[in-house]
Amino acid sequence: ADEWGIDSSQIVACGSSAGAITVLHGEYALCNASPLVQHLPAGFRYAGIVSFAGAIFEMGEELVWASQPAPMMLFHGDADANVPYNVIRESGVGFFGSKYIAGQLRTMNSPYYFYSVENASHVIATAPMDDNRDAIDAFLSKLVVDKEPLMIETDETTIGAPEVRKDFTLAEYIASNFM
């Protein structure tokens, strides 16, 4: 960071789909002092996280945050068949999606911006990069740069749109990604 003149306290991690899963896992590992983050400089923290259709996979029934996470912006469609929107648990493991994470952040009084799109599929892994730049700019300006202690939730619904399937099994999530 020093060599390139980068202020490491202003790094925002962003990812889409598997990349969103990666950045969310990175922040979760930092918050829980996981051995996976030992190679990072002492005290390193992200300034913010932007996740387009991401989730956290955890060997346990709940996510447990040992410290307050960076401000997060979470985009997700509630009919995503690739990455869970809310949570799916099976055999003592959980796959925790954006809705679930947003609920935890609200309970923790941690700054976040959750943008939920009704009846939207995994298209939310890419669409907001074009369609929601103003919302992303607002998140970066208010929650990251100005450090405003805000919890923002936006629910986008298309009037008259037909309902689509929203309940998927773990096997269906796996099949949609690997088969």
Where do the model's predicted regions map?
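Primarily recognizes the serine-hydrolase "nucleophile elbow" in alpha/beta-hydrolase
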Residues: A1-Q68
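Conserved alpha/beta-hydrolase "acid-adjacent" motif
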Residues: A81-G97, A125
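A structural motif corresponding to the C-terminal end of an alpha-helix
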Residues: W4-I6, A42-F44, I101-Y112
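Short beta-strand/loop motif that positions the catalytic acidic residue
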Residues: M73-H76, D80
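Gram-negative outer-membrane beta-barrel domains
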Residues: W4, S16-A18, A81, G97, ...
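C-terminal catalytic histidine-bearing segment of alpha/beta-hydrolase fold enzymes
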Residues: R106-M179
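Hydrophobic anchor at the start of a short beta-strand
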Residues: S8-I11, M72, P111-Y113
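Extracytoplasmic/secreted proteins, especially bacterial periplasmic and envelope-associated proteins
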Residues: I21-H25, R45, G97-Y100, D131, ...
